[in-house]
């Protein structure tokens, strides 16, 4: 049972004398570990990227694919691999919510690291993250840093594949830029406010009517107004647009 082996991992950390606070396991198939990355101090309205990765208790790991279109790959990890990554995060102190600032660093990128717990998620914000640094920020960054390509065959139960979501969040920010085409689906607005833009959830079957997924920030028109539109796959635990606000820095 996922609760038991994640709980055992937390116990092992404590017995090792690593000084981490008591950690509570994630619910079965719940979120275990997630890393969201933001660049610079000024966010573009509606620019809600996929997380670098999100790991779940059933071994599912969804990792963003860099590029102008928001897509992801899905990996299926063994229980041992999930335990190892969870334990590493606990050792780094990521089971306790905190904010780690970078003194004297301007325009820094920010990581938001979320660790699943039975009592609710713990979120750590790291400014100017540098996994090679010797300070507490470096230690925290190392606890969250993960390149899915580094996972070996022994860590996986199946080959990686394209992530095929059942739903998409479509995030629209009004713009004065000319639209290149009309939005063919139900109206983009009004929606849930997300990152100074409006968000609606569409089924994958509806998004397929757009043809190839549009690039993030492409301009569409509806109701006489132009919008910069971002079509973002929703992750397994993201129920609605409001969920996306939880991971903002």
Predicted regions and their residues:
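Bacterial N-terminal signal peptides that target proteins for export
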Residues: 1-7
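C-terminal active-site/capping subdomain that shapes the small-molecule cofactor and substrate pocket
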Residues: 10
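C-terminal motif of bacterial Sec signal peptides marking the signal peptidase cleavage site
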Residues: 14-17
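Charged, amphipathic alpha-helical segments
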Residues: 81-102
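Extracytoplasmic low-complexity, Pro/Thr/Ser/Ala/Gly-rich segments
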Residues: 21-81, 161-163
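Residue-level marker of positions within ordered structural domains that often coincide
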Residues: 60, 90, 118
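Short, well-ordered, aromatic-rich surface patches in folded extracellular/luminal domains
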Residues: 19-39, 95-249
């Amino acid at each position: 049972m996922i609760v038991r082996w994640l709980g055992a991992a937390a116990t092992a950390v404590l017995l090792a004398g690593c000084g981490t606070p008591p950690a509570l396991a994630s619910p079965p198939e719940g979120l275990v570990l997630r890393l969201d990355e933001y660049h610079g101090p000024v966010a573009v309205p509606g620019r809600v990227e996929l997380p670098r990765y999100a790991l779940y208790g059933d071994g599912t790991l969804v990792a963003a694919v860099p590029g102008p279109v928001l897509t992801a790959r899905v990996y299926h990890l063994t229980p041992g691999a999930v335990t190892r990554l969870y334990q590493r995060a606990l050792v780094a102190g990521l089971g306790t919510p905190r904010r780690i600032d970078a003194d004297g660093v301007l325009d820094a990128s920010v990581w938001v690291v979320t660790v699943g717990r039975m009592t609710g998620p713990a979120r750590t914000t790291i400014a100017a993250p540098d996994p090679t640094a010797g300070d507490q920020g470096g230690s925290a960054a190392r606890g969250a840093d993960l390149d899915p390509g580094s996972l070996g065959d022994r860590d996986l139960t199946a080959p990686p594949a394209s992530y095929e979501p059942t739903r998409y969040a479509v995030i629209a920010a009004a713009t004065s830029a000319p639209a290149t085409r009309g939005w063919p689906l139900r109206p983009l607005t009004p929606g849930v406010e997300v990152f100074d833009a409006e968000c609606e959830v569409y089924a994958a079957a509806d998004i397929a009517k757009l043809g190839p997924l549009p690039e993030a920030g492409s301009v569409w028109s509806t109701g006489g107004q132009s919008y910069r539109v971002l079509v973002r796959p929703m992750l397994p635990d993201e129920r609605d647009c409001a969920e996306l606000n939880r991971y903002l820095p």
